[in-house]
Amino acid sequence: MKLNYKRTIFVGFAFFLICSFWQAYDNTIPLILTNKFGMSQAWSGVIMALDNVLALFMLPLFGAISDKHRGKRGRRTPFIVVGTLIAAVMLIALSFVDSAQLRHLSDVSAIDDPAALEQIYDRQAGETLLTPSGDKFVLSQKFTQEEFIRIRSQVEQDGKTVTNPDYTNYVVPARQACAWDATAKSPATLVFFIVLLLIVLVSMAVFRSPAVAPVSYTHLTLPT
């Protein structure tokens, strides 16, 4: 057997695009959902699992559709091009929605800003919150306002700069609670974000199945 180098490079590039997309998706979307919209880890996980649920139906569907497609551009190319373009445009659109949500959090979003920390404390002082490990706490019972405002995201420990556990365990959940309050007051931004996210997932399904379908059949050719 002789390797079809051109076909192998094209198929490898398709896999590279898919892997790059999912790396960006898996590293970015959960942070937006929890930090900007204030969603819990549980609900963020549900949304992040949608791609696997949709893949069960979408990948076989678009694979079968591309198998039956006939056109001047071939069976796979239109799906690959259209799916990639739509996914790229929708990812850019998601960044604009993210920026719109950030404007709702402008008074509490700054890191290590005393004014932002004061706003967070005033809004969440009496609320019952959860640390990342799931422990409940009431902010006003843990810190006075002055103590809370002095918390910084990083501290010096044994000559090294490390993440402050008080910031991770108490400031971050309090800020996320403020983000959820803002989302509850203006849910349209979250709804629009989820709709765009679904479009991204569907467009990637349009691209993924046709892109990898040829790999089993055409990356090797018999010598003549």
Where are these regions (language model features)?
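Central cavity-lining transmembrane alpha-helices of secondary-active solute carriers
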Residues: V46-A64
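Helix-loop boundary and gating motifs at the non-cytosolic
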Residues: K2-N52
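Cytoplasmic membrane-interface "Motif A"-like loop-to-helix N-cap segments
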Residues: K68-G83
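Conserved small/polar residues in nucleotide/adenosyl-binding loops
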Residues: T218-T224
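Hydrophobic core of transmembrane alpha-helices in multi-pass small-molecule transporters
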Residues: H104-A115, P173-V206
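Intracellular juxtamembrane helix-capping segments at the cytosolic ends
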Residues: V206-Y217
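Residue-level signal for conserved functional micro-sites within the alpha-helical transmembrane segments
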Residues: W22, A55, L59, M204
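MFS 12-TM fold signature
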Residues: T84-M90
